[in-house]
């Protein structure tokens, strides 16, 4: 996700549209800002989950939450990068197209997003008031 963002950012800074750099168009700038937010949230989720696992806790719920949050965020980031870059984003001219294609599978590996959400929903239903779920 970070590599695709860096490439899209560089493209948006250099590419001109309607007399100004793409980055100066609000829609493009907002997409790149959303990427930064998703990247930081993903980093924090991974660090949090790693801390839970390092403490010796099973981390089943935390792992599912992190897997869903990060894989969905990476998909959004890759999608925005393709959008920012237009046709170049889906061409072989940069690795953004490859990243976009490969990141899609992250939502399936180790259980699809929907299976993890189903598992989380069951945990929420079983939880007692004050418990984590």
PLM regions: where:
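Alpha-helical interface subdomain recognition
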Residues: 1-133
């Amino acid at each position: 996700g970070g590599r695709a963002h860096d490439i899209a950012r560089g493209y948006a800074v250099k590419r001109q549209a309607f007399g100004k750099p793409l980055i100066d168009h609000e829609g493009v700038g907002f997409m790149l800002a959303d990427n930064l937010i998703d990247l930081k949230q993903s980093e924090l989720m991974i660090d949090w989950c790693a801390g839970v696992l390092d403490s010796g806790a099973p981390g089943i719920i935390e792992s599912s939450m992190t897997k869903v949050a990060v894989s969905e965020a990476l998909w959004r980031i890759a999608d925005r990068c393709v959008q920012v870059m237009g046709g170049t984003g889906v061409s072989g001219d940069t690795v953004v197209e490859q990243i976009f294609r490969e990141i899609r599978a992250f939502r399936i590996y180790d259980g699809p997003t929907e299976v993890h959400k189903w598992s989380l929903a069951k945990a929420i239903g079983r939880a007692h008031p004050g418990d984590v779920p």
